[in-house]
Amino acid sequence: MSQEEKVDAKATLKTEISNNKKNDKQELELDELVGKLSIEGTPQVSQKLSKEEKHAHQLEADSRSIFVGNITPDVTPEQIEDHFKDCGQIKRITLLYDRNTGTPKGYGYIEFESPAYREKALQLNGGELKGKKIAVSRKRTNIPGFNRHYNSQNQYFQQWQWNYPLMAYPNPDTFPYYPPYPPNQSPNQNFGYNKNNYYRSPYNNKNRTFQKKHFNSAKDSTKNIRSTSQKPVVMPSDNVKSSTQEKDSK
């Protein structure tokens, strides 16, 4: 190899080494940025909890929380914190607002660090906050999809629908299913027609005031007219006979 070729080879090696160093520096900088974004140098992925685990966490948080009602609209979370700061360390304060108007609903929740702090806060029930007595009680665990008026409303609905106060809905596994009729209701009635203690007799000829009768002629039908306040029906044949008799008498 000539001297010129050796010089060119050295120059290419130097450029390759410098490029590798630059790439290493860039990789180190990227690693540092990722480490700053994550906690403890490793990115954490949020794990989905099951319903039982979520309910357990909710019960544990509610065991340290209280409900505060009858709050004036101008109360701020800082004022609530000052009112309950002697009870213990407060972890979270939640005030509820109307989603449509944005006005305060007049109640909220306070979560403490320990259940012992909650017991101290319950002793402040009936105290005054900005000149108004507040109501303090334990926080009730919220169950999604549960309505506290369900039991009372369900009884009225079943009574109207099935005419029984505590009758269960039909099981789809045992279809066809037909609920039994009550003793004072006929099969011709709709369900719920009997809810006002009104009894309607079934449609049969015995219970109707007018019964079907068959006559051989029109004269027989006029003799067997039922006794009502209406005027008796006069057949056309009788009118013709009465007019002919009057003419003959004249």
From Swiss-Prot:
One of its GO terms (biological process) is mRNA metabolic process. It is found in: Cytoplasm. One of its GO terms (cellular component) is cytoplasm. Residues 1-27, 178-250 are annotated as: Disordered. The keyword Methyltransferase does not apply. Disulfide bonds: none annotated. CDD domains: RRM_II_PABPs. It holds the Pfam family RRM_1. Residues 64-141 form the RRM domain. mRNA-binding protein that may play a role in modulating the expression of cytoplasmic mRNA. This is RNA-binding protein SGN1. The gene is SGN1.
